[in-house]
UniProtKB/Swiss-Prot annotation:
Subunit relationships: Part of the 50S ribosomal subunit.
Keyword Transcription: no
Keyword match Protein transport: no
NCBIfam families attached to this UniProt entry: rplD_bact (TIGR03953)
GO biological process entries: translation
Gene that produces this protein: rplD
Protein name: Large ribosomal subunit protein uL4
Pfam families: Ribosomal_L4 (PF00573)
Family label: Belongs to the universal ribosomal protein uL4 family.
UniProtKB keywords: Ribonucleoprotein, Ribosomal protein, RNA-binding, rRNA-binding
Length: 206
C-alpha cells in the first residue's frame, strides 16, 4: 500500500510504501475490542472500598435482651440493616486487570492500524518538529491538514517544542512510538505517523 507523505505545512514530501503485514489486514473488531477492554481494565485504580460489619466501629454490646420485647432478636448493631452498620457485599480494594496474551495484543495493534489505513484515517508526515513552541502556529498547521481530533505518533523522542505546543490543543494527543496503543488509536479520528514512527513500527513487527 502506497501513501503520500506530507509536511506540517501541507506540502508533498514524496510517498512511502506501507507494509501489508501491518497496515493491510482485514480489520477484526473483536480482537481490537478485546485489547481495549484489557487496557481499560488494567488502568482502573481499584481503590474503591466500603467497610463491612467487621470493620465499622460500633459497640459490641447486645442491643437488648433476647426475649420479652416483642421485637426480633438482635445481637449486634454492626449488621447492615441498621444505620451506621457495615455494608453487605461492599466493594473492596482489588485489581481489575485481566489476562490477554502478548501475541493477541500485538495482533490487535496491527488490526487497529489496518482499520485506520483502510478507513482513510491514516496520515504520514515527514517529521513533527517546531522551531518555536507556539500553539497558534501548530493550530494553523493542523487546520491545513484537517486535523481536529488526532493521535500523533513520533519516533523514540518527541520534539520538545512540538509536544509543548500541542499539549494545549483539545482532542490532540502526542506520543512517542513506545506509547502507541490500541485504545488511543481507536478513540481518535485520525492517526498521524511520522516517518521515524513508521520505520520503528516496521522494525518492531519485522
Amino acid at each position: 500500500m502506497e501513501l503520500k507523505v506530507t509536511t506540517l505545512e501541507g506540502q508533498e514530501a514524496g510517498s512511502v510504501q506501507l507494509s501489508d503485514a501491518i497496515f493491510g489486514l482485514e480489520p477484526r473488531n473483536d480482537i481490537v475490542q478485546r485489547c481495549v477492554i484489557w487496557q481499560l481494565a488494567k488502568r482502573q485504580a481499584g481503590t474503591h472500598k466500603a467497610k463491612g460489619r467487621a470493620e465499622v466501629w460500633r459497640t459490641g454490646k447486645k442491643m437488648y435482651k433476647q426475649k420479652g420485647t416483642g421485637g426480633a432478636r438482635h445481637g449486634s448493631q454492626r449488621v447492615p440493616q441498621f444505620r451506621g452498620g457495615g455494608r453487605a457485599f461492599g466493594p473492596v480494594v482489588r485489581s481489575h486487570a485481566i489476562d490477554l496474551p502478548k501475541k493477541v495484543r500485538a495482533l490487535a495493534l496491527r488490526h487497529a492500524l489496518s482499520a485506520k489505513a483502510k478507513g482513510g484515517g491514516l496520515i504520514v508526515i515527514d517529521k513533527a518538529e517546531l522551531e518555536a513552541a507556539k500553539t497558534k502556529a501548530l493550530v494553523g498547521a493542523f487546520s491545513g491538514l484537517g486535523l481536529t481530533n488526532a493521535l500523533i505518533i513520533d519516533g523514540a523522542e518527541v520534539n520538545t517544542g512540538f509536544a509543548t505546543a500541542a499539549r494545549n490543543i483539545p482532542n490532540i494527543d502526542v506520543l512517542p512510538i513506545q506509547g502507541i496503543n490500541v485504545y488511543d488509536i481507536v478513540r481518535r479520528r485520525k492517526l498521524v505517523l511520522t516517518k521515524a514512527a513508521l520505520d520503528a513500527l516496521e522494525a518492531r513487527f519485522k
